[in-house]
Amino acid sequence: MKVQGVLLIVICLLFCVTGCMDPDHAKQLASKGSLPAQDEDPSKMMGPGPAASSASAKAMAAPFDTSTRIQDVMNDPVFGGYGRLLFPVDEWYMSGSTLRDLQLTWYNDIDPEKTVEIVNTLWQRANAGETVFYDIYTEEEKTVDPEKADTGLFFFRGEPGAKFAVCNAGGGFAYVGAMQDSFPHALELSKQGYHAFALIYRPGAQTACEDLARAISFIFAHAEELNIDTDCYSLWGGSAGGRMAAWLGSYGPAAFGGDDLTAGCGHHAIYRPQRSYRKRSAHFRLCGRKRWHRKLA
């Protein structure tokens, strides 16, 4: 009985000590990792919740939206030094400060959602390690002619080993309206499995055709690393770009300083008719709402 009484007293003393611990002492133990602090917010110990994690992942997957400033897209480090070529080099050919407000000279009906899809697609692929832009001129060539620094190919990758197309935007041979007139076409072609390039060229009919000839020659020279079938390619263009596609499709790259290559299997001109043809011209298709065949008849 004495032993049981002693045990009962010891147990009571233990309950008194632990239940009446000084709060300051409890905090000291908590700081040493022995106890959780009484005023600690449990949510802070659990890390970001599912909603926060989802929002962060979404921002990484699609960093741009219609409210994004155009300058922020141009200067995004993922794009390196070529982000500026997503938009007209001479900024007076465009207006608006955000992707929602973007307007290009001589164009209308620009779809902000498509603009966002284009820049997000390129950003995602570049961020994943893909090359989405290729220089077509060497640094030495750009030093001799600085305007060649404002050229290049944006690459919308298709299925491995697929055929390719080069899309050429219009702009009256004064600027390149790629965001409206070549990027959307290249993106949709890539969704169909084709490799598609959007050319950024120097203004002027002659220099534009020289840049297109150089671009085609570049693609042929790097076909193996690009995993591209060069057997039958197509040229696309709107307005001034349609003329480029027609001229290169008719006369071939060599006529404009490029390599001696085939003229391609087809060229597609949107908005502009072509009046000059050769026996070896590629298949030619006019696209658009107006019936250009009546003017060509």
Language-model segments: what does each one mean?
Residues 16-19:
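C-terminal motif of bacterial Sec signal peptides marking the signal peptidase cleavage site
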Residues 81-82, 86-160, 209, 251:
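N-terminal cap/lid segment of alpha/beta-hydrolase-fold proteins
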Residues 151-162, 217, 226, 277:
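Short beta-strand-to-loop junctions in surface cap/lid or active-site-entrance loops
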Residues 162-171:
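Short beta-strand element of the alpha/beta-hydrolase
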Residues 179-197:
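Short amphipathic alpha-helix adjacent to the substrate-entry channel of hydrolases
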Residues 210, 214-281:
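Primarily recognizes the serine-hydrolase "nucleophile elbow" in alpha/beta-hydrolase
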Residues 285-287:
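Short beta-strand/loop motif that positions the catalytic acidic residue
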Residues 292-297:
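Conserved alpha/beta-hydrolase "acid-adjacent" motif
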